[in-house]
Amino acid sequence: MTKQPIDKVKGFFAGGLETFNRLLWAKRCINCREVIFEADGDLCSSCGQQLNLVTSGDYCRRCGRDVSEYAVFQGSCPRCREEEIFFDAIARCGIYEQSLRGMILSFKSDSGKATKTLSFLANSALSGSTFLGEIDYFVPVPLHWTSKMRRGYNQSLVLAERLIHPAAKVNTDFVRIRRTKKQTSMASVHQRLKNVKGAFAVRYRHPYIGKKVCLVDDVKTTGATLNECARQLKDAGAAKVFALVLAVADQRVD
C-alpha cells in the first residue's frame, strides 16, 4: 500500500475520532439535551426561540397574566379586576410553557440545572419591574422542612440568593409551619386557598415591620400561595409585599 492511501485512511479515522469526541463531550442544551456546538449559550436554537416566545409578551403587573398593555386599566386587567390580591405588584419572566417550563422543572429537581439562565431571566424581570427601588428584603416562599429535607434545597431560596440588588437582602424569617398537599393536585381556586390557609408564619423578632418585601417563587398558577404569603406578611407588619416569579401558568387573557 502506498503512502497516500495510508494517509487517507489515517485521516478518515482521525476525523471520525474527532467527531466522536465532539459528540461525547459536547455542550448540551440545558432544556432538551441536544448537542450545542456554539461556544456560548446554554440553549439550542429551537429552545432559545421557544424561550423568546414565552418571555416576550406584555402582562398585567397586578396578577401576572398575559395581557395587552391596552387591556390594563387603573393598574389591573379584566381577569383580576374583581379579585382580592394581597401582594401589591408582580414581576415575571414569562408564561409556564415550552422551554421555560422545561427549565423550571429541571431546576426543581436539580438546583444546578438551568440556574444560570433562570437567574439571568429573573434579574431581567426584576430590573423591569415597577418596584425595583422599593425592596428592603427578598423573601423566598418557604418549603415545609420535610419537603426541603427530601429535595435537599429550596429552589426559591436558590433563586433569591442570585438576585442582584444594591440594597435588598435575602431573609428567611418567613417559614412554612404546616405541611400542605401539592397545589397542582387541586382543581379549584377555593381548594387551593383552603389548602394553604394558615400554612405560613413569621419568626419571632422578624425584621418585616414597616418594610417592603419581595416574595420570590418559581411558578404562580392561581396565586393562592403567593396571596396567603402576602397576607401573612402584611399581618406581621410589612408595609408592602411584591412578588417575583419565573413563570405564570395558564393565565393568559383571551
Give the location of each predicted region:
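Generic hydrophobic alpha-helical segments
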Residues: C47, L118, A122-L126, V196-F200
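Extended interfacial segments that mediate partner engagement and assembly in macromolecular machines
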Residues: S56-R162, V189
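N-terminal juxtadomain amphipathic helix
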Residues: T2-S99
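Arginine/glycine-rich "motif VI" loop of SF2 helicases in the C-terminal RecA-like domain
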Residues: E83-F86, H165-P166, K234-A238
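A short coil-to-beta-strand element that immediately follows conserved catalytic motifs
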Residues: F87, Y137, A167-V175
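ATP-binding/phosphotransfer module of carbohydrate and carboxylate kinases, centering on a glycine-rich
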Residues: I36, G128-G133, H165, Q251-V253
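Short, well-ordered alpha-helices that flank and scaffold nucleotide-derived cofactor binding pockets
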Residues: Q49, S124, E161-H165, N227, ...
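PRPP/pyrophosphate-binding module of the type I phosphoribosyltransferase fold
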Residues: T2-L17, R22-C29, N171-D254
